[in-house]
Amino acid sequence: MAKRIVLFLLTNLAITFVLGIVLNIIFQVTGIQGGSTGGILVMSLVFGFAGSLISLFMSKSMALRSVGAEVIQQPRNHAEQWLFDTVQRQSQQANIPMPDIAIYHSADVNAFATGATKNNSLVAVSTGLLDNMTEDEAEAVVAHEIAHIANGDMVTMTLLQGVLNTFVIFLSRIISTAASSGKDENGNATQNTLVFWIVDIALQMIFGVIATMIAMWFSRYREYRADAGSAQLVGKEKMIAALQRLQHVHEPQEMQGSLAAFMINGARSKELFMSHPPLEKRIEALRNL
């Protein structure tokens, strides 16, 4: 299963890309082009933040569907009761409303937190995590997710993504307008619509990749903060033990999401595109607290 924090980003990019095309049509119909930089900026802000906000408010339901999880309404067994009690206790310690809780069936040792606000959040853990970790280790993982919620990481990621979206749309629009503009033999301003669309779409894709790299850097930074938050709630030794456990189990594929859903376990890939820092760096940071 490979679909968590970057699921938020992919959804956001898809929505922003579609909205960017809609924006192109609006500009063509209204005649707003490169001569109205202010108008382009305003429209870019509106459409840029629309993509990230839609992704944010869809994040909880998308996360549940993507892993086939159901919210625990009433604990039915020891594992559910333990998770319920742990989340309840830690959310009280962190001074946040108790999140919804879910367990999903997966061999991956993983957990994630998501939701639009602290009042509408979710903590979900895999059966693989519950089966392969001690209660102390699992407690630290849950605390890590609670820290994400307490830190407001989903909202913060949304604001960052909105700014990035705005620049992606704005810069693509400005450059594509300049590249497609010219003058006819009479000196009248002209624009090659085909060139405009090709350049604009290509630039949105290129700038979108750069924006994703920035978002991934920010996600890695927030992971360190969530680790520190877990250490405050349950002690750094438990969090270190949980990360060391992850080093000895099969790591799942890189999560392709804020949705931030912010999962505990990111896979190894080139660090620029990693949503999580390497485990050894996280352990070192905890030891230095």
From Swiss-Prot:
Protein name as catalogued: Protease HtpX
Instruction: Give the source species.
Output: Actinobacillus pleuropneumoniae serotype 5b (strain L20)
Entry GO CC: plasma membrane
Q: Which NCBIfam families does the annotation name?
A: PRK05457.1
Say which family it is in: Belongs to the peptidase M48B family.
Question: One short Pfam family name for this protein?
Answer: Peptidase_M48
How does the UniProt record describe the way this protein sits in the membrane? Multi-pass membrane protein
Q: Which gene encodes it?
A: htpX
Instruction: Give the matching HAMAP family.
Output: Pept_M48_protease_HtpX
Please provide the record's keywords in A-Z order.
Answer: Cell inner membrane, Cell membrane, Hydrolase, Membrane, Metal-binding, Metalloprotease, Protease, Transmembrane, Transmembrane helix, Zinc
Task: Give the transmembrane ranges.
Answer: 7-27, 38-58, 155-175, 194-214
- Chain residues that bind Zn(2+): 144, 148, 223
- Output the lineage of the source organism: Bacteria, Pseudomonadati, Pseudomonadota, Gammaproteobacteria, Pasteurellales
Q: How is the cofactor bound?
A: Binds 1 zinc ion per subunit.
Per the record, the major location class is membrane
The top EC class, named as a word, is: hydrolase
EC number(s) from the headed UniProt entry: 3.4.24.-
